[in-house]
Amino acid sequence: MRRHLLEGAGALVLGAAVSPSVAGTAPKGPAAPAAARTGWFDDARFAIPAFEASHPEQPGRVRAIQDRVRADAALWARLQRLQPLQGAAVDAALARVHTGEHIRGIAVRHGAAIDTLARTAVGCALAAVQAVGRAGLTNAFVASRPPGHHARNSGREEGFCFYNNVAVATRHVQRVLGFERVLIVDWDYHHGNGTEHLFYEDGSVFYFSTFDADAYPRSGTAARIGAGAGRGTTLNHPLPAGASDDDVLTVYERSLVPAATRFDPEFVLVSAGFDSREGDTLGRFSFSDEGYRRMTRVVASIAARHCGGRLVSLLEGGYNLGGLASAAHAHVWALTEAALAMPR
C-alpha cells in the first residue's frame, strides 16, 4: 500500500503580516446582472502559500480556477461576487467546531499568515451560507484554499487542512441561520475523516462520501454509519481505483438520492474535491468534466426538491491545475443552470 503525499506533509511556518494591498482585495470584473443567483467567493489572500513552493497545495490552485471562470464572460455574468466574513464572526464560528487548543495550535505552530489564510477560507464559507440562507441567492461556489475536510481538533495541519471549513459552515447554518438538517456531500478523492469525526454522533447532519479507501487517510468504510443519535447519518461509499463517471453516478442514484429523500435536508453543502478527475496528480479515479457536471445536477436536484435549492459548494482537493480549473468550471456552470431553473 503506497504512502500518500498527504501523510506527514508539513506546512510552512509563516509569521509575516498580510499586506493591506492583498487582504480583502475585491475581485475585478463586470458587475453581475440582477438576475444572477449563484454566489462566487474568492479572495486575494488565497495567494498566501501554506507549504513549500513544490507542494501540490499551492496558491496556483485557486488562481487557475479564477482565470478559467473569469475568462468565460457568459458564466462570469451569472455570478454574484461577494466578500468573506471576518473578525469576531469567524472567531465565534470556529469556536462552535474547534477547541481552543486547536485554534491556538494552528496559530502558534504554523504562524499568523497561515492562520489568516485558513480563516479567510472559513470566512468565505460563512458568507456563502449566509448569502444563500438569508440574502436570496440560490447557491454558491467558494474557490478557497486550503481545503478543510481532514481537520479535526489535533492542533495542527492534517492532510493539507487547518480548519474544517464545511463543518464550521454547517454549524453556522444550524446555530445562526436556524436550519436544522444539513446534508454534506463529499466527492473528494480522499475520505473526509475530519468531517465524519465531527458529526459522527449527530443526527442533524448527514455525511455522504465517495472516495478511494486505499488513499490517505484510509479511514472510511461502509461499516461506519454513525453512532448514538447519529446512527444512520453517515454513509461511506469507497470506490475502486480507476472509478468512472458511471461508477459514482450509479452510487448517487441508488444511494445518495434515496438517503436524501429519507433525511429531507434543509440545506445542502458540498465538499467539492476535484482530485477525483482523470489526470490528477494525487488521485487514481477517472471522473470527467461532464461527470462533475452531472454530479452537480444530481446534488442540485436534491437541494431543489427538499430545500428551495439551497446549496453551497466549497473547494477541497484538486492538484492538476488544468484539470482542476476545467472541472470546477463545469461545476460552476451547472450550479448557475440549477439556480436559474428555480422559480423566484
Predicted regions and their residues:
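HDAC/HDAC-like amidohydrolase catalytic core signature
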Residues: 4-15, 22-344
